[in-house]
Amino acid sequence: MEDKKDALISKTISMLLDNGFAVADISGQFSASFDIIARRNIERYVLKVLYNIDTLKPTTAYQLAKVAKFLRSTATIVGEKAGGGPLEDGVIYYRHGIPISSLDTFRDYINGEKPYIYSGPGGFYVKINGEALREMRMKMSLSIGYLSHYLGVSRRSVSLYENGSSATIDVFLKLQEIIKSDLVDHTDLFKIIPDNFQEEERVDDVYIQMLLDILERIGLDTKPAYRMPFDILARDEEVVSLIASLLSEEADKTKIEIMKKISSVLEDDAFLISKHSTTRENINGCPVINIVDLEKMTSKDELLRMLEKRAR
């Protein structure tokens, strides 16, 4: 299974590079909730690759969604199979609120072909543009009763479609037969946001909690990071996104290299925080700030200025 997953990761990275993305590959280097960070101009993705999408755990999904939110990116999973069969191309699947697709579907998506079919209980569905349906039905002088009979559904179902509910593929195709117009609600199925972001997370490390409190005080929204190559996620309401890690006694070079990779791809700041006084201002291109200096700061701008200075 791991060999198949590794092969899919390699294919995904090659596809992203071929399509003009800058890529940070952290798969195999760290047991993280994501495998790939990618950016192309303003498009930013945090990707997890799974051979079988049914192996996704709720905790992994939450961490993936959280890091994507804080890095102003889209969380998505590239997979190959669900249950006993392959993922259908052109279809979006969801597990624990995270959008999932085949590699070919994701390739089409980043090249402008947005899928409009999604997998749900009992089959595949299309979200209907209710306003367009109502407008065309009235323009064609079709009653709700006539349309329900033609479609083989209840009058209530037609009313629900006109209020933006989804229809099965079979019903949608029948709708298209009689109403030859675009009836798809073109909501980006990759941009649907999970609703569990406010989940409370216990922080056992007193230093991590202290850092979260300091960053909150200077104007940043923060979250602890678990199963990631950093300890803290932070952002403001505008454009700032940060990742930070508590510096251990012996600097973890692999961890620092991964943070630097992510920082470089997304063009966001990554920095290390020392518990003790240190003369080091930079490790392998990653700025270092000691916790005492951080405590003295009164604004996020002060932090950003120091990061810019020490990143040189």
From Swiss-Prot:
Ranges where the HTH cro/C1-type domain occurs: 133-186
Residues of the DNA-binding region: 144-163
Membrane-traversing stretches: none
Lineage: Archaea, Methanobacteriati, Thermoplasmatota, Thermoplasmata, Thermoplasmatales
Gene3D superfamilies named in the record: lambda repressor-like DNA-binding domains
One family name in Pfam for this protein: HTH_3
Coiled coil start-end: none
Source superkingdom: Archaea
Keyword field: DNA-binding, Transcription, Transcription regulation
GO molecular function, one term: DNA binding
InterPro entries in alphabetical order: Arc_TR_HTH, Cro/C1-type_HTH, Lambda_DNA-bd_dom_sf
Protein name: Putative HTH-type transcriptional regulatory protein Ta1363
